[in-house]
Amino acid sequence: MNGSARKGNTLTAINAFIKGASEKNEIEIIEPDKLNIAPCKGCGVCQCSNGCVDKDDTNPTIDKIAAADMILFATPVYWWGMSAQLKLIIDKCYCRGLQLKNKKVGTIVVGGSPVDSIQYELIDKQFDCMAKYLSWDMLFKKSYYATARDELEKNKDSMNELEGIGKNL
């Protein structure tokens, strides 16, 4: 799940991960910024039916997430949190939360501050809470500091690390 609307460091990280993972796995990148998904209205109708009542890309997207064996959440840091694009999809997962239990997940977070800054900790905690609530097996959490568009790509150690994580799935 690519939480970035740009083709920058977050996508570079995803592609490095995919390079390692694609040998043994079928992979699809979901790009929320290219989908027509309305924000959750909190209407609660989804709790009595099998999905969201919005006639948009919500249900087909949640179907893909529910069918996946492993979910990678990748996001740039926006104001000490994940991107709005990624958060929108996560909010809409409420409509079928029980179908999303017991997934294997990993996170990649790319930001413009050193990786020991609070922004990464806050995002990790949010994903940890979701993982606990949905009984997810958190396989890995990786954070990277990169501000220039091609900065992460030039960091061979990071690229090798991400490819290795993908290979070891």
Task: State where each predicted segment sits.
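N-terminal beta1-alpha1-beta2 submodule of the flavodoxin-like/Rossmannoid cofactor-binding fold
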Residues: 1-74, 80-96, 140-142, 152-169
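Acidic, low-complexity intrinsically disordered regions
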Residues: 75-76, 132
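Residues in intrinsically disordered, low-complexity segments of regulatory proteins
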Residues: 78-79, 135
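Short, glycine-/small-residue-rich phosphate/pyrophosphate-handling segment
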Residues: 100-141
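Short, solvent-exposed loop/turn segments at secondary-structure boundaries
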Residues: 117-120, 150-155
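Active-site rim beta-loop-alpha module in soluble metabolic enzymes
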Residues: 146-147
